[in-house]
Amino acid sequence: MSNSFSFQRQNPGSPLQQHSPIHNINTGGNSNSVSNQSNNHPQTPGHHVPSRKPSIVEMLSSPPPLPNTPDQEDIHSFSLSRNTSVSSRASSIYGNVNGGTSKGSIVGVDWAEIPLVELTESNKLVSINSGFSVQKAFETLMEHNLTSVPVSLSKTDSTDLTNCLTFDYSDVNTYLLLIMNKINLNDLSIYEGGDDVLSNQQKDSITKSINKAKKGEEVPVDFIVKLHPKNPFVKFSEQDTLYKAMESLGNGVHRVAITNMNGTKITGILSQRRLIKYMWENARRFPSLDFYINSTLQDLKIGSNNPITIYEDQLLIEALLKMFTERVTSLAVVDKTMALIGNISIVDVKNVTSSKNSHLLFKSVLGFIGYNLTQKGIEEGQDQFPIFHVNNQSSLGRVIAKLVATKSHRLWVVENRGSVHHGSVSSTSSSNSNSNSKSVTQSPKASPSTIESTLNQSVSTPSNVQNIPPGSEPGGLPGKLVGVVTLTDILGLFASSKSNKKIDPQFARNQRRRSSTSTTRSSFEGSSAGQDLFRKSYTTSAPAKTEGKR
């Protein structure tokens, strides 16, 4: 049996994304290791010698310096972004006005009291209307290098966001699974204007839209965004304080809307990823963060010891289905010994939307990771391997630096090498980032050598992951997976430090899971090559294969 996937081919015209200096580690055969890159080498006469860049260990040691400070030109100063963000410059002004400066030092500012207007992006908010096709909505994500886009329920005015849903890669995944007959109407949580029970007419309309999609015909985006459970569309005024947004995002909402004072117009979207970047770039301005940034994950007791995983030899389609059923956006890829091999994200679904790549759906997850890294090497001219793991002795500051640099939502926690008797993560971590954070005893900063060792483990992993056999020597893999730490955990920790309220990082995810078993749903949740999406016919059957146990 075969189904047609219908999206037209588009030209890869989106601009290349700028990467921060430590977004990826070059692991090509002709490249020096991280430690070699930071060493001094004899200069060759007649050759231009570029200025020395700070090593990765230096870059992960502390937050970037504030702008306009005397040490700005110091060789160890750095910024995780090539250009200071608008919000960072605004907060600099805000800090100077409220705290003042003296001999280059900034008087501490309470981040919780900063108005959200300081974080509003100055660039135009991208949105679409519900009359867009799923294809056009997908192209919008690709063109603007977004992970989500607001969908106005107005059929004509995409800027009218007083009532809107959102379209993201979870919706693309749902669309794909529907077409592949991996999920059906009973697996979905249909949102139809708040009705508790769908009428027969509504069910017929939904069934017709699903059948049209399977035939390769275009369907409106408002159809697909109503099929995947999401969190409430949370709005805050520009005059609300940062604490309010931090509390919401710390409870697991992926992004919130910022409106004008009258609440009549959305002026920006604040995501978890953007907020953590803002907090990192301005960390020196917020003395209340010092204790947390210098403490280890083990001491802070944040993160979860139950990461959701997929085995390396399971099919990619199984991984996509697991992300749908578990309502998560990422899976850790492990071998049979629970050694961490890699990571697969919901955004990766874009790489199988082309008919020429449909065969990857029935290939192993490990093979798909290898394909992704190969493509990234082709696009950027080098083999690359992202740093996606930490250990419990990593300081929170270095964890945040990695999250910002890799633009990730989570990092996998692996067992410390050489710490066989270290104990399980359950004794050091909690799924609740609240964990009485105020009573945590401060620990010394993690030594650079520990982090350097962790980074060197990443570098030692071959860029072509397909060449790693399941039973390979442990030295070739980061280590045994014992947990995961997310943006939600960290933002929840910051929020709980300012109040006695319970911050539950699992709140939003549990809400999505509950809504997936009902007939109603709330509406809002919280990379870069053009491809044709689901245009040609491909089979939904696959060779018989035994599913790996989890």
Curated annotation (Swiss-Prot):
Q: Where on the tree of life does the source sit, at the highest rank?
A: Eukaryota
Question: Which Pfam families does the entry mention?
Answer: CBS (PF00571)
Provide the CBS domain boundaries. 227-288, 302-361, 374-431, 435-502
Q: Name one GO biological process term.
A: regulation of mitotic metaphase/anaphase transition
Keyword Plastid attached: no
Q: Does the keyword rRNA-binding apply?
A: no
Q: Where is this region: Disordered?
A: 1-78, 421-477, 504-550
Which SUPFAM superfamilies does the record associate with it?
A: CBS-domain pair
Composition bias of kind Low complexity appears in: 24-40, 421-443
Compartment(s): Cytoplasm; Nucleus
Any GO MF annotation of the entry: protein serine/threonine phosphatase inhibitor activity
Keywords of this protein's UniProt record, alphabetized?
CBS domain, Cytoplasm, Nucleus, Repeat
* InterPro entries the record matches: AMPK_gamma/SDS23_families, CBS_dom, CBS_dom_sf, Ssd23
Main localisation, per the record? cytoplasm
Q: Which SMART domains match?
A: CBS (SM00116)
Q: What Gene Ontology cellular component terms go with this record?
A: cytoplasm; nucleus
Enumerate composition-biased segments (Polar residues): 1-23, 444-469
Family stated for the protein in its record: Belongs to the SDS23 family.
State the protein's purpose.
Involved in DNA replication and cell separation.
Q: State the protein's name.
A: Protein SDS23
Question: Which organism's genome codes for this protein?
Answer: Debaryomyces hansenii (strain ATCC 36239 / CBS 767 / BCRC 21394 / JCM 1990 / NBRC 0083 / IGC 2968)
- What is the gene called? SDS23
